[in-house]
Amino acid sequence: MQKTTPITAYKSTCLSGKIKIPGDKSISHRSLILGGLANGETHIHGLLESDDVLNTAAAMQAMGACIIKKADRWIIRGTGNGCLLAAEKPLNFGNAGTGARLVMGMVGPYHMKTTFIGDASLSKRPMGRILNPLRLMGVEIEATHGDRLPLTLYGPKMANPIRYRIPIASAQVKSAILLAGLNTAGTTTVIEPILTRDHTEKMLKAFGAELEIKTDAEGTRFIHLNGQPHLTGQTIHIPGDPSSAAFPIIAALLVENSDITIENVLINKSRMGLIETLWEMDAKIELLNQHKTGGENVADLRVKSSMLKGVTVPKERAPSMIDEYPALAVAAAFAEGKTVMLGIDELRVKESDRLSALAQGLKINHVDCEEGKDFLIVHGKSSAKGLGGGHVTTHLDHRIAMSFLIFGLVSEKPVTIDDKRMIATSFPEFIPFIQQLGGKIS
């Protein structure tokens, strides 16, 4: 067993400079999957080279896609839609929940056996939300108790197209069903009552899938996919990941006399919940150099130290910022007044019980907070006096690790996390980037 690697963050001042955040994790996974399915070559610029994404690349290679890195781009020669090969060994996704769930959807309708395994954290996460629609399509499944990994899919001779209303706001469920529809004759329909990140829909259209999206008067989206399309390789430029940008954003807002610019960040409207919330808290964040890259809105973010105030974050906003709540909780600890985060029960089934881990980390660093089944209330104060000094258990969760290192840059006393290794699952450059801006982490 590998040894844990603790690391400590110390009170810092005057963060400054420019950084370019690594490519968006959601788009990186989808680029590899669709590139691996398409005919011809797909060229990817700005791929996030994190452990999670590379595990998805390995899975696509195991099923017949040719993937190589050449200079600063990745080149994929796909198998052609409907032509994946059966993997000879179980597909190991490590910590990658997104990769595992999307690939389950993609391979489910193939008439072959595919086994999925992962690390201890991923093996605790529920997969039923993906497996239930696959069962309706005719996929037979052998899973560990509670629909968890390890699990094996046995695809049908001919999958059934389904019309499926998503019971929870989940881009992963929506995307898995649409990817399953690619190798299913007929029309697959996903009904989405609450908008979630829409990268899959945009990218499917770009690769040549026949996709129709209608929205009713209540805002419910009906996404219709005609099965078995011809997919053609594309050139993709991946913008910076807003979920990773959250950490330097919060650091610059909280560390006194800071002024940083984060270049080339994705500002898709379905991913803007954190920035909208921070603006409500009086954060000084400017969107500069706004433009489009590959159909996505992108901007540079200029962030300056700000005196934040507590706010109530409505539950309706949760899908657009579900991965950013750990960073927001740190901001809330140093904001004047009470911050209430509602409708965040989805955090309980992330890489850890993220809601519980957040509350534990805040309390051990002397922040007054209340944890409920689906909410977190943080009683913040603009003074850092008396805060920090804790040793945080990260529970193998990269976002808990990064959040409390940011906390330590602001608090009076240093903050230590029990292990930094899992940060590599989403943001391998995190520590050197923060150090480059002037943050004290060692």
Curated annotation (Swiss-Prot):
Q: Where is the active site?
A: D323
What broad class of enzyme is this? transferase
Any Pfam family hit: EPSP_synthase
How it assembles, according to the record, is: Monomer.
Identify the main location: cytoplasm
Entry's EC annotation: 2.5.1.19
Species: Bartonella quintana (strain Toulouse)
| InterPro entries assigned to the protein according to its UniProt record, in alphabetical order | Enolpyruvate_Tfrase_dom, Enolpyruvate_Tfrase_sf, EPSP_synthase, EPSP_synthase_CS, RNA3'P_cycl/enolpyr_Trfase_a/b
Catalysed reaction(s) here are:
3-phosphoshikimate + phosphoenolpyruvate = 5-O-(1-carboxyvinyl)-3-phosphoshikimate + phosphate
Which residues are recorded as binding 3-phosphoshikimate? K25, S26, R30, S170, Q172, D323, K350
The protein's job, in short, is:
Catalyzes the transfer of the enolpyruvyl moiety of phosphoenolpyruvate (PEP) to the 5-hydroxyl of shikimate-3-phosphate (S3P) to produce enolpyruvyl shikimate-3-phosphate and inorganic phosphate.
Q: What pathway or pathways are given for this protein in its record?
A: Metabolic intermediate biosynthesis; chorismate biosynthesis; chorismate from D-erythrose 4-phosphate and phosphoenolpyruvate: step 6/7
Q: Which GO terms describe its molecular function?
A: 3-phosphoshikimate 1-carboxyvinyltransferase activity
Residues that bind phosphoenolpyruvate = K25, G97, R125, Q172, R354, R399
The GO biological-process annotations, alphabetized, read as: amino acid biosynthetic process; aromatic amino acid family biosynthetic process; chorismate biosynthetic process
Q: Which family does it belong to?
A: Belongs to the EPSP synthase family.
Tell me which domain of life the UniProt entry assigns to the organism this sequence originates from.
Answer: Bacteria
Q: Which UniProt keywords apply?
A: Amino-acid biosynthesis, Aromatic amino acid biosynthesis, Cytoplasm, Transferase
Listed name of the protein: 3-phosphoshikimate 1-carboxyvinyltransferase
